[in-house]
Amino acid sequence: MDERFNKWLLTPVLTLLFVVIMYQYVSPSCTSSCTNFGEQLRSGEARPPAVPSPARRAQAPLDEWERRPQLPPPPRGPPEGSRGVAAPEDEDEDPGDPEEEEEEEEEEPDPEAPENGSLPRFVPRFNFTLKDLTRFVDFNIKGRDVIVFLHIQKTGGTTFGRHLVKNIRLEQPCSCKAGQKKCTCHRPGKKETWLFSRFSTGWSCGLHADWTELTNCVPAIMEKKDCPRNHSHTRNFYYITMLRDPVSRYLSEWKHVQRGATWKTSLHMCDGRSPTPDELPTCYPGDDWSGVSLREFMDCSYNLANNRQVRMLADLSLVGCYNLTFMNESERNTILLQSAKNNLKNMAFFGLTEFQRKTQFLFERTFNLKFISPFTQFNITRASNVDINDGARQHIEELNFLDMQLYEYAKDLFQQRYHHTKQLEHQRDRQKRREERRLQREHRAHRWPKEDRAMEGTVTEDYNSQVVRW
C-alpha cells in the first residue's frame, strides 16, 4: 500500500518540478526578478522596477503605464563630453565606414595643444574674407621673386632671420661662413639673391627700415644687384614680418636701450628725406641712454618705442611723415592704425613671437618651403623677468594703445589663418585617403574575377587530363 502511494505521489512532484524548470527557461526575466526580489527582501534596499515586455505592456491600460515610473533608455555611444563637436566637413562622411574611423584616430597631436587634452577654443572677433585667410604664394626661387623681411625691433626678428638663412631646406642652401654677419643666399645656379634681410643683404635700406622705406627702396636695390638681361622678366616682392605682444616688446626695448642700444643710425626716410631734429628729437642728450629707468623711458613723449609696430607697418606718407603739424593727432592715429592693418593683412606672411610652432606651420604652407629643425618657444626672456606693478603695465598699454589694437587684430587674423589652413589640409588628407581606398577597392574588384577564371581554367585542365588518362 505504501509503495503504491509513493508512486502516485512521485508522479505529480516530478511533473511540478518539470513545469518549474521549463518556466524558468521560457521566461528568464521572471527568474532574475524573483531572485532580485529575494535579494531586496534580504538587503532591505529598494530597486527600480524591471521594464516589462512589449506584450505585457500592450495588455495593460495606457493610462496605467503613463502613471508608472519609466527608466531612461540606455545611452547610445560614448557619453556627452567624451568627444568634440563634429567638424562641418564630417557631415558628408559615411558613418558605417570602419576604415575612416580607424584613420581618424591616427592623427598626430597638435604640439601646442593643452596638456589636459581639451581643444583650445578660439572665438573669432573680426570678419575676414576667404581671400584674407587663404595664403599660398607661388614663390619662384629660380626666377626673380624676392622675400623681403621687415624687421621690427624686439619682436624675435633676429631668431626668425637666422631661420631664414640657416634652417630652410633648399636645393642650394645659403652659405654662412664663420665670423661673417651676412650669408650668401643665391638662387640655384645663379649669382642672384632671393632673400632681402639683415642676414643676407644687410641693412641696405637703413637700420631697421620700416614699410615706408622698404617699399620705396627695395625694388631699386634689387635692380642694381640683378643681371641686366633679367630686367625684362617680372619680379614679385613678398613682404614678411614678425609681431609681438606690445607690453613685452616695450619692456624688451627698454632693457635693450638701458644696455646702450640707440639705433640712431636709422634713416627714417619718408617722401625722399629724413626727418629734421625738430620733427624727431632725441630723448637723451649724450651718445646713448644707458642706465635709463623705466619711468624716464616712459616719460619721453617722442620716444620711438611708443606704438613702434604701427608706425613701422603704416604708410607714413599718408600722414605727412614725421611732421606732427600736418594734421590733428586723432586723425593721424586713425589713419596710421588703419594703414598698418591693411599692410599687415596684405603681406604674404606675418608671424607672432608668442606662437613659434604656428608661425613655422604657416610659413611652410605659405611659401611651400620646409624648415630643417622645428622652432622653439622661449617663454623666459628679459621682458618676462621684469617685475612691474599693475599701474606701470596700464601706463605702458596707454602709451602703446595703437599697438595694442593692432596686435589684437593681428592675433585674430593669425589664428583664423592657422585654423583655416589646418582645415584645408585636413580635407585634402581625407580626400587623398578616400581616393586611395577607392583605388584599392577597384584593384581588388579587377583582381578577383581574374583569379576566379584562373582557378576555373586550372580545374578544367586537371579534369580533362584525368579523362585522357582514363
UniProtKB/Swiss-Prot annotation:
Membrane spanning residue stretches: 5-27
Single biological process term from Gene Ontology: heparan sulfate proteoglycan biosynthetic process
Glycan attachment sites: N116, N127, N230, N323, N328, N379
Location(s) in or outside the cell: Membrane
Role played: 6-O-sulfation enzyme which catalyzes the transfer of sulfate from 3'-phosphoadenosine 5'-phosphosulfate (PAPS) to position 6 of the N-sulfoglucosamine residue (GlcNS) of heparan sulfate.
InterPro entries associated with the record: Heparan_SO4-6-sulfoTrfase, P-loop_NTPase, Sulfotransferase
Domain of life where this protein originates: Eukaryota
Tissues/organs with expression: Ubiquitously expressed.
Molecular function GO labels: heparan sulfate 6-sulfotransferase activity
Lineage: Eukaryota, Metazoa, Chordata, Craniata, Vertebrata
Similarity section: Belongs to the sulfotransferase 6 family.
Protein name: Heparan-sulfate 6-O-sulfotransferase 3
PANTHER family: HEPARAN SULFATE 6-O-SULFOTRANSFERASE 3, HEPARAN-SULFATE 6-O-SULFOTRANSFERASE 3
Keyword Heme: no
Compositionally biased intervals (Acidic residues): 88-113
Residues at which 3'-phosphoadenylyl sulfate binds: 151-159, 244, 252, 376-378, 382-383
